[in-house]
Amino acid sequence: MLKDITLGQYFPGNSLVHRLDPRTKLLLMSAYIVAVFIVGNMWLFALVAAYVIGVTAIAGVPVSYLWRSLKPLRFILIFMFVINLLVTATGDTLFEWWIIKITTGGLRQAVYISLRLILLVSGTSLMTLTTTPIALTDGLERLLSPFAMIGFPAHELAMMMTIALRFIPTLIEEADKITKAQTARGADFETGSLIDRAKAMVTILVPLFVSAFRRADELAMAMESRCYHGGEGRTRMTVLKYTKNDLEAALSMALLIGIIITVQAVT
């Protein structure tokens, strides 16, 4: 299951989506999140899903990568679906037994919440799969640079977020190695009660924390040895420029949001 987490991983390519300016991707992702949250019917959910699938096809990223990003969330999806199904009690009653009451409003809310989570995870995974951590750092720093005039640490924040993203696949790989090593020594993580399995996880978490601190220390030493002292006075190898492709991508997102708002207003 750990290998199924795609957040922070990069899928190499030279597609139109890969070549977009990272600032454009970050802005479009913000607009996409807004679009997902204002969607209010199944036809619009299908439209947003088709948009994501279309962008995935243009990027040349296998759909299996998006499916892998959703697999670790299956228990959260089930939990959220059940909670919303049982808590929301609006509309007509579909089923009622003892204190359990399922209504049309509850079913609609449960489906909508689950679809929103699926679309959000798919969209964010697609952005990280088509953008290198360095490009994300550069794009985020450029977007936040106007706030540096009032003392906002734009470069430092961008660097922290990039390091965090870069460490996700590294820690996942490390956790997988530790799990296999402990399993070879006789550790059992699949059977037993919930408490027994939680205790068994300690044999993974302790070495993982030790490894994380060691890697963080090594990274700090490497940055210091290269005379890194923040963003002040630093130059950039790559100069970011908006292109025609960025404009077309922005127009496609504007069209999507325009359709959503129009349909929502009419229905």
Predicted feature locations:
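Membrane-helix interfacial "entry" motifs
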Residues: N14, F37, G60-Y65, W97, ...
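Juxtamembrane/interface alpha-helical elements of multi-pass membrane proteins
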Residues: L73-A187
